[in-house]
Amino acid sequence: MISHLLPTTSLTIHMPSIILYPIYFDKSRPRRFRCVPKDKAILNPLAKNIADVVRDLGYKCKLEPLKTHPADWVNPGRVEMVLPEKIQKKYVINEIAKVLLLRPTVKTDPLSLPIQNVPARLPENPPAYPKGVLGNTILPLHSPALSGGGISENMFQEMMQEMQKQPGLAGGMNPMAALAGMGGPAPPMPTPQASSSQRKQKSIEPEYDLDLE
C-alpha cells in the first residue's frame, strides 16, 4: 500500500533536520557506513521504507527519491526528517532501526514508490553490477543498476569521479574502497598499457587511476 508521504516539493524544512540514507541501516555494509550495529541493521534497506517508519513514529519528513549517498550509487533515495527539540539523532536512528528489523524488505516493496517514466513493475533481471562488485538484490525501480541493462562503464566512471568530490567519504577514502564495502571485492584497477619502447626499460610500479576501460 502506498503511504501518503509529504511530497518533496510541498515541504520546506526550517527546523533542525537530519538526513537518513538507506546505507545507514544496511547490514551488508562495513561499520564505517552504517549508523547502527550490524545486528540492528537489515538487508536491502530502501528510502521509501525508512520514510514510512519515520512517519509511523510520529516525525515529520520528506522523501527525496533522487538523492543518492556517494557510496551507495545503486540505491537512490534519502529521507530528510525534522528533529524535534531535545531528541538526539542517535536515539531516532536506533528507533528507526528497531522498526525496520520488524519490517524486513521484501521483493515487492519497490512498487510502493512509483516513479514518473519508470514502468511500475518488478524487473525481470537481477541488478547488474560491474564485474567484481556485489550489491543489494532489492532496489528502487529507478536504480541505475536496473535501468538500461545495468551500469555502463562510462556511467560507472562518472560515479567514481563524483564520489571523489564528496566530503562524505571519511578521510578522503578512495571510492574504490567504498565500492568494496558493497559485500564483494572492488573491481580490479586497470594497469596502464606500456608502449614498445617502455617495455624495454626497467619495469616501474605503475600508478593506478580510476579510468576503467
UniProtKB/Swiss-Prot annotation:
Family matches, as Gene3D superfamilies: Signal recognition particle, SRP19-like subunit
Keyword Secreted: no
Matches recorded under InterPro entries: Signal_recog_particle_SRP19, SRP19-like_sf
Gene Ontology terms: biological process: intracellular protein transport; SRP-dependent cotranslational protein targeting to membrane, signal sequence recognition
Region described as Disordered: spans on this chain: 176-213
Subcellular location: Cytoplasm; Nucleus
Alphabetized GO MF terms: 7S RNA binding
Effect of gene knockout: Leads to sensitivity to camptothecin, thiabendazole, microtubule depolymerizing drugs and DNA damaging agents.
Keywords of this entry: Cytoplasm, Nucleus, Ribonucleoprotein, RNA-binding, Signal recognition particle
Recorded superkingdom: Eukaryota
Disulfide bonds, paired cysteine numbers: none
GO cellular component: cytosol; nucleus; signal recognition particle, endoplasmic reticulum targeting
Assembly information from the UniProt record: Fungal signal recognition particle consists of a 7S RNA molecule (scR1) and at least six protein subunits: srp72, srp68, srp54, sec65, srp21 and srp14.
Family of the protein in this entry: Belongs to the SRP19 family.
Purpose: Signal-recognition-particle assembly has a crucial role in targeting secretory proteins to the rough endoplasmic reticulum membrane. It must be involved intimately in the translocation of a wide variety of protein substrates.
Official protein name in the record: Signal recognition particle sec65 subunit
Protein encoded by which gene: sec65
